[in-house]
Amino acid sequence: MTWKIIADSGCDYRQLANPAIDTEFISVPLTIQVADQVFIDDASLDIDKMMETMYATSEASKSACPSPDDYLRAFEGAKHIFVVTITGTLSGSHNSAQLAKNIYLEEHPDTQIHVIDSLSAGGEVDLLVEKLNDLIEQGLSFEEVVQAITAYQEKTKLLFVLAKVDNLVKNGRLSKLIGTVVGLLNIRMVGEASETGTLELLQKARGAKKSLQVAYEELIKAGYAGGRIVMAHRSNEKFCQQLSELLREKFPAANIKILPTSGLCSFYAEEGGLLMGYEIG
């Protein structure tokens, strides 16, 4: 195998439907610890069970990044390797991948490895993986793919919509009072990934209908113009379909993909949440 695209489970794909020629896609899982149980975020994970377990405990759940060894095993057998990780502000996965790259290149100096901090999660990571596959399919050199994906990342963004914030409260990132208000008043948190990879709140919207309109407005305001958008959702396909209809009224040729979130992205998005990656311009 000449090429490998490797992503941690900040990416929602377990496999690519149409991998480029001589290209293999590998998902390197994070683990999620809920009370005394550890869930490995691979293709065999029962995400529903993980979420049920998470909501049944008052303890804070936490994720653990892949080790450098996990990445080293994934590197084996390819000449040209691209790695995409969840934002370094949420996980040490990017650091593990960089360390693995340095170790691997000492032993395999002819291999080419490029590690990308997505500065994001979910749908935007999915977009970067899709684009890498497209660029390799075009027959570009490794250096040309690096240049093209770097430029492409400047034109992608993440918009998130959260219907529950239990995890944020349990982990001390939101106060219990705010968490209670969100639940009682049916508040949706609408936000984005910043340029430095932190998740920032844009608006609070009350109810699904209002949050749908707010999400649409934020996409347009940010520069979405009918290009690719990946709506990664945790048990909320209805919202995705409704948002797709709104977008297609304005952009009939919009390239929209809807898919379920990985275990890790379900952990962050929570029930009813979305992590949408989209192109601007």
Where are these regions (language model features)?
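N-terminal glycine-rich anion-binding loop in soluble enzyme alpha/beta folds
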Residues: 3-64, 70
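Structural motif
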Residues: 4, 80-82, 228
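Mixed-charge interfacial surface used for oligomerization/domain docking
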Residues: 10-26, 30-31, 90-93, 97-102, ...
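A short helix->loop->beta-strand "cap" motif at the edges of active sites that frequently abuts
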Residues: 110-111
